């Protein structure tokens, strides 16, 4: 059996890093003593929460070309020792005779940035798969541990989903739900 584990929202804190890099390159002018308002990011539709005058094209350029290493490579872990927990889960899955697969939707420069992220935190995994679309993750696994709402919503009936609870996926259905790895 092939058991997949996604990266964003499970191991990597993509949202927090995206927000800080966005604020760095798209600063808002504030009055003296005024603080940046807290964003309530309750979906993964980044255009709902961050302004890009060029829409999806500008967002994709920012994510996958201009700021990939900063966002994907230098993001923190979702929880302390998430990558170590990934390593332990990977070994457990292998010991049980199954195939663990780390799987992520990545494009362009986010691929090497993601490999850097995994490397710098000492991920000891054997199989890493990059896909271009969220629903394509299901083609590589029988069971998938993910926090991504689109991936959860596109689950085929014969597959099993395990949702890692996050503020942007609370309303998504899954076969099983966990707090973290």
Which residues make up each language-model segment?
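Short phosphate-binding/catalytic loops that engage adenosine nucleotides
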Residues: 98, 123, 159
């Amino acid at each position: 059996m092939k058991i997949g584990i996604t990266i964003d929202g499970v191991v990597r804190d993509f949202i927090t890093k995206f927000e800080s890099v966005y604020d760095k390159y798209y600063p808002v002018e504030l009055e003296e003593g005024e603080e940046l308002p807290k964003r309530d990011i309750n979906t993964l539709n980044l255009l709902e929460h961050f302004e890009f005058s060029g829409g999806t094209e500008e967002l994709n350029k920012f994510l996958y070309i201009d700021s990939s290493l900063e966002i994907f490579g230098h993001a923190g872990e979702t929880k302390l020792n998430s990558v170590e927990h990934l390593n332990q889960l990977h070994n457990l899955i292998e010991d049980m005779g199954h195939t663990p697969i780390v799987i992520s939707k990545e494009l362009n420069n986010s691929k090497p940035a993601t490999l850097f992220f995994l490397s710098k935190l000492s991920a000891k995994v054997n199989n890493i798969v990059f896909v271009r679309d969220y629903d394509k993750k299901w083609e590589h696994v029988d069971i998938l541990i993910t926090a991504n709402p689109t991936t959860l919503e596109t689950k085929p009936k014969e597959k099993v989903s395990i949702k890692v609870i996050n503020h942007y996926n609370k309303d998504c259905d899954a076969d099983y739900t966990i707090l973290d790895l």
